[in-house]
């Protein structure tokens, strides 16, 4: 300790970095006469008392105020912490409102098409409409026999077929060998083969003809078509899962939070501000975590796309909570009053909230999410409930923010309950694909192409706690299918839960082979996600790129477009499906499904190309495939596809086919939007992150002149 003397009756000492004041009482006076009856200053403690001296050490860090009550009251009167963070939330809402305004034109265009009001909301059972009946002239049209498809097991490229008028107008026939009109994926109990299990209504009459357009959906260009250069740069990949656009939003949000935490505040001496900032963002984190959230509904995006921002906002909240708590803990530790403060109820509640926030952050890491998903979910549910309760006990002004978060969570739980269906499902193991096919016949409507559901399997075969796990899977079938197959999921065997599901499906097949009907009870929740305000059928061309199990998204989208084309509700002229697999044997179980798609009498040209990337075990599969002819326009290639060439082919066909109607405006649906030119090309991609990066690069590299000619090129990632 260093000692210093002042001229007056009070002298200043320094004890390390703490200010020490010496008060020598005068004769006949007491400490009370000096105003020191209890504690001379808030958050101070008596270092020593001697007959003529009194040492008081001021705490280096105070609660809400500064070192003196007068300055604290002045600061409080000039700066309202609660109002400040409330204004921060208003800024966040204002930014959201701007984004919603940008999405309104396309949302309005979507909902002018009446069926869109009721699609993608609730899973249900619907009466299947009678399949489209062709007029007599079309029904009696000659059918071209099926010729053997082009098959190139060594070709490294898979470019799309060239365009010519004869090709687009010709009739062709899909294979009906071994398929009745009601083949409908009925299980072949005698063979039990995956090929028979996937069998679906392959039409025996399939000449491609022009349809009468009954109710074409209106088309509205997206901002990526209006501002292609800006969109291209925003979609550049910084690292897997992070684009420039996401990074920009994250950076802007971080700047706003840091600004709110530092403006007229020192986080080391005034930790209260960081607490206010953390509490104000709790509703943001909770709302972005819900499956049914208002921002997603307004923007037309699924919860899975907002989950990235939920995780980031959650990390910032945990950081702010720790800064807030450590400021007080440090001050109490130096003052030696840590245990005394823990006897105060609201301080104990604050410590509980701190522990909950850190536990949530720890169990939210990718390790726990990927390896121990059940632990991640359990800690999240328990941790959030305790955290919100502790915040209310810790700070009364925080209650409104907590109530908003609780209201959003409660609404989500109610909607999830409403969107859940209890049903009976059939399981089929697809050995070549390493997938389990789940079919729920009783649920046949209520979803849009590209959406997914969350499923629980209520079977002891999934383990003691298998019923507690809920997993998302893309829907691989079309709603209200004339094949009456219901909702179909294809679950890739990739983890413990999906492996148990695959084994359960195998046991189910053995039971059926012995004459026993076996299935499982499931809880299906959804649908969620999907293309949002984007209408695939409103474009002139479509390219779907799928990698591995991503074929479920592509199958659903293409089958939906085929059905809409049959009803005269599609503008599409060209549909191209590219599927990238490791082994060509993965094509075998899906040949009936592809045959069904290609055999439809559609106005649009359809081509499917499958590319395998590993030739090690390809010989046996190629030998099997060579024994039966592939349907027309289904091709198999070795090596990766040239997506740029394929996209160029789709653009050419979309532009050329539109010339048939050029000069006579096409009458749109309810939107009243007419067009005499192409309505753009949509590229849908589902698969590994690298595949999505390649697709974004190819879309961004389209020449501006060709982009304008076709009406824009947009991309949808699932």
Label each residue range with its predicted role.
Residues 68-78, 97-105, 120, 128-142, ...:
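Reductase modules of NAD(P)H-dependent flavoproteins
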Residues 47-78, 321:
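Extracellular/lumenal N-termini and interhelical loops of multi-pass eukaryotic membrane proteins
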Residues 97-121, 287-295, 369, 403, ...:
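Transmembrane-helix exit/juxtamembrane "anchor" motif
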Residues 440-543, 559, 565, 637, ...:
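FAD-binding FR-type
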Residues 120-222, 623-630, 668, 676:
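Intrinsically disordered, low-complexity terminal tails of fungal membrane proteins
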Residues 369, 374, 378, 382-392, ...:
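Membrane-proximal cytosolic interface modules of multi-pass membrane proteins
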Residues 221-418:
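Membrane-embedded alpha-helical bundles of multi-pass integral membrane proteins
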